[in-house]
Amino acid sequence: MITPFFRSPDRAFTLLRGDCVELLKQFEFKFDMIFADPPYFLSNGGISMQSGKVVCVDKGEWDKGGTPESIDAFNRTWLAACRDKLKKDGTIWVSGTYHNIFSVASRLTELGFKILNVVTWAKTNPPPNISCRYFTHSAEYIVWARKSAKVPHYYNYELMKRINDGKQMGDVWRLPAIAPWEKSCGKHPCQKPLAVLSRIILASTRPGAWVLDPFAGSSTTGIAANLLGRRFLGIDKEEEYLYLSQNRRQEIENIKTFAKYRGKIKDIAFAEQTDVAHPGEDESWGYELPF
């Protein structure tokens, strides 16, 4: 019997504590979309610059690298578990840097996914390269793939075109890194900005959709999903980050805060009412988690 770590009153935001591979084996459910921000394996004692200070880039024990073989095996295992939980027409997004993204892309292909795009998130405010011996690391990569090569996926082409001044949306997104107001409940070392997750969710899901994040962290995926009228299941091992996620979700239960955060995300302004739903407005809201 699975007991949620936290569930919001409207049941649109649920958190589980544990290993995603083990937990996903324990229930039958199919998600419309998965976003995953797995370990990048870049914690190697390096340094970077933050707010004018030299800081270590290490994120934690969970982010320390192994051998190429062990990294491939790790990615193969969790991606296979996630594939089993995708609907036939579902898609998955996986973010990374050069440290892990090539392994991820190879494992996706190996497992039968069809890669649709590799989005480059070009950060408009990256930290400087203090060694001055190579180019500044100013981008992350997000692989978008569908479960099956033969089953069509959902893509909100018209909305993405509206967001991009009437032109087809490209695969290079110039968006800033996380803003200070997004850290109001605390800080996660790998927290993604709501602007990135909002675009991903609007592009690849319909209102009322179920979104899974197997490495939830501070649950930016879940906050973006709920701001956009989608539902969310997040899994993480770390109690500290689950409490941070819970606090972030409770923060937007305040109507004024909910509206303020929606107002700060540019892409939401382009979304018509048909792109955003609320609990009870769509019959798909009757499709619930089995715990």
Task: Mark where each language-model region is.
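PRPP-dependent phosphoribosyltransferase catalytic core
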Residues: L244-F291
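Core catalytic lobe of class I
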Residues: M1-L244, Y287-F291
